[in-house]
Regions:
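C-terminal output helix
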Residues: 107-118
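Active-site residues of response regulator receiver
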Residues: 10, 55
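Receiver (REC) domain active-site loop signature in two-component systems and cognate sites
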Residues: 58
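Active-site beta3 strand of CheY-like receiver
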Residues: 47-53
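Conserved Asp/Asn-Gly motif in the active-site loop of CheY-like receiver
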Residues: 34-38
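Hydrophobic/aromatic residues positioned on beta-strands within the core alpha/beta folds
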Residues: 82-84
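Two-component/phosphorelay signaling modules centered on CheY-like receiver
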Residues: 13-32
Length: 122
């Protein structure tokens, strides 16, 4: 079975490192992390992920702009993007952040793995 590729873009390096190590430990995923949103699009092109977890609020460029770059790239246009954010409540809908699914921070590992499973099964 091929490992699914997960790309985590978040300026909180401790969070991305922990998530990467935990997901890779399962043996099911190959994980790439990036803490600089300005590098995310090019890294995504190289890595060709199945799912991108993308923080909305980052220095230099926000997740919404990164998502637009990814969506406008024919190579990446169909990749699942899931926003990670602390700026919305758990009761808001995905339409409140541009129609993308999201997980509200702080997010549990269980919520991340459930989200991965659901989106890879779709």
């Amino acid at each position: 079975m091929d490992k699914k590729r997960i790309f985590i873009v978040d300026d909180e390096s401790g969070f991305t490192r922990l998530l990467k190590l935990t997901l890779e430990k399962s043996g099911n995923y190959e994980v790439l992390e990036e803490n600089d949103g300005t590098k995310a699009w090019l890294k995504a092109r190289e890595f060709k992920p199945d799912i991108i977890f993308l923080d909305i609020v980052m220095p230099k460029i926000d997740g919404g702009d990164v998502a637009q770059q990814i969506r406008s790239d024919p190579l990446l246009a169909k990749v699942t993007i899931i926003f990670l954010t602390a700026i919305v409540s758990r009761t808001e809908t995905t339409h409140d952040i541009g129609g993308f699914p999201f997980l509200a921070k702080p997010v549990s590992l269980d919520a991340i793995t459930r989200c991965i499973t659901e989106h890879l099964a779709a």
